[in-house]
Amino acid sequence: VQAMTYFARALGAARSGNPEAAKPDIAKLNELRDKLRDAKDAYWSGQVDIQAQVASAWILSAEGKQDEALKAMSAAADAEDKTEKHPVTPGVPKPARELYGEMLLQSGMPGEALAAFEATLKKEPNRLGTYMCAAKAAEKSGDNAKARDYYEKIVAMTDGAYQTRTAMRAHS
């Protein structure tokens, strides 16, 4: 639980353009990872390590080191892809592969971003946010048919829900 708090704060600070504010929380994540490793808890130490990797990648991005950030984020996503979810825990709030896709999209690489979002959906199906990102990436890469398919899936997933998202209404 502590790790999730530090991760959320670090990621939020880095993505808000305040990398210095993220660094103490990443230090705390590394400290927690080491304690878990010392306690021989390989699963949770690995999960916390991935969180630290993700947040560190976003710090690099916030510092304008985009190539390094993309490499670091790709490595974090690969590490998360190799782990299995613990049977008694919920999935991660936002998969590393999805965050990698967001970084790719932000870096002007919509085709690569789309591939990352599609990989996320294979492992973590029916994620509304991932569908939204995939639709945007498809649109930006010029694949309007695929974008429309994704927007239609979003509308179907949210059928009957109060629709306040203008992006979804614009494509339905």
Specify the residue positions occupied by each region the protein language model found.
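Boundary/linker segments of alpha-helical solenoid repeat arrays
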Residues: V1, R33-D41, E80-V88, P125-G129, ...
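"A position-specific structural signal for the A-helix of alpha-solenoid helical repeats
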Residues: M4-A8, V48-Q51, A55, A62, ...
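TPR/TPR-like (Sel1-like) alpha-helical repeat modules
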Residues: I26-E31, S74-D78, A138-Y162
